[in-house]
Amino acid sequence: MDYILIDTDVILDFFFDRKPFAEHAIQIFILCENNEVKGYTTPVIISNVYYLLNKIAKHDVIIEKLKQLLQIIDIIEIDKAIILEALNSKFKDFEDAIQNFAAENYTTIEIIITRNVKDFQQSKLAVFSPEIYLKNKNP
């Protein structure tokens, strides 16, 4: 079983039904729901998703959707050590650095799923777009 960190853009593709990316995001979440992969995210990602959804939807609706999401994926911790690693890293995007080091420090995560693959060039983990990950998973 693969253990994956699902980045903000993939979750937003799902919630905003952004074409053509939404279909791949849906397939990723179906794999999680069917226990074919173990999906994770971070508190920062959940906060960002809430903030962006709040621009177009009501608070109660967003809360319910996030609760549903958290029934199929888990949240990993971010602590001071992870923040310091991110601050001292060569990542150009601080938020991506936080996600990366949270995933790297969580012992079972092997893969980051993001459409911003180029932003994770410094990662020690495998990094795939949802489309490429799904092609590799189902050749």
Predicted segments with their positions:
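Short, well-structured N-terminal submotif of metal-dependent ribonuclease cores
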Residues: 1-40, 54-61, 122, 132-139
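PIN-domain endoribonuclease scaffold, especially VapC-family toxins
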Residues: 4, 26-93, 97, 101-106
